[in-house]
């Protein structure tokens, strides 16, 4: 990383930021803790998917295997469906898997269009265009970061510089806006999911309970959160990579009514799913 002898001076239209580089080590250590926290969330989510996979691979419905995908085919931290199951045909049921305390549910990067004077979802980076359209509706008429492209997205800065800027003003704090209670359901339906499994709360349907699990619909007060996200604290040239992210999430997950059914515990599986102790499905098969 390049060294700055004393300080780096940032000028913007409304404020001057001074970064004292004597505190670089302390700033880096703070960020390492933040990075590890984010990594733990991702790892915890993956472990929860595997826990459910280890149960579903032993299950059947209507006399046929309910889940026949391999461990490598789990969605993980990607835009793919977390777990696909079989009802009327192979992989026709999509299930979103969520740890209840995860900070972001459905998220996408956004940018400010100076000609149209509003924020938009970065559609080119989203494999589901209709999801981008839904985010655009949520962002309409929202004032975020003074409705301008943040200067640090136009200029290269180091992570210690960004951390000092963030601590020096509340201008770049997260923004939260209330959104309809159906938003998360609609977003995951567009992704191809029919159900959502939430740790500690259980299984819910998003639109119609097409498998007849007798699950409740996922219904809870929701909000959209807009924040500056650090994707990388240091590239080969010593600069960090930032973006503006929008994500939908429950306002208070504790207010969610628990489901009677869950996929993370064999004793709480829906009544029409049969668990077979000796059954194992290690590779996909065409069963219908």
Language-model regions: role of each:
Residues 13, 25-40:
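A short, surface-exposed helix-loop junction/capping segment
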